[in-house]
Amino acid sequence: MTGILIKLDDRPDIIFDNGTFYGGLHCGDCFNVQTNQWINVRLEYSDEWVVFYRGKSYPVPFGKRVEI
């Protein structure tokens, strides 16, 4: 299923194309983010929510299309 990555109640979540919510993402959850192509990332939390891609951390790409 695909949707848009959002922040809801201080936690990343996904709103799907049909209007339903995933229900909140958790540390260790993996999903695909659409950039120029689909990339697989892992969600983690330290001082803030980040995603890991190829061993590096990046800010969570809120507003991007994701696939889970």
Regions found by a protein language model. Give the residues of each.
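Short coil-to-beta transition motif at edge beta-strands of beta-rich domains
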Residues: 21-35
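Short, compact, well-ordered microdomains
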Residues: 37-68
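Ser/Thr- (and often Asn-) enriched beta-sheet segments in non-cytosolic proteins
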Residues: 4-7, 32, 42, 65-67
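Short polybasic amphipathic segments
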Residues: 11-17, 31, 48-52
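Mixed-charge, Lys/Arg-rich low-complexity intrinsically disordered regions
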Residues: 1-23
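A short, compositionally biased
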Residues: 8-10, 25-29, 44-48
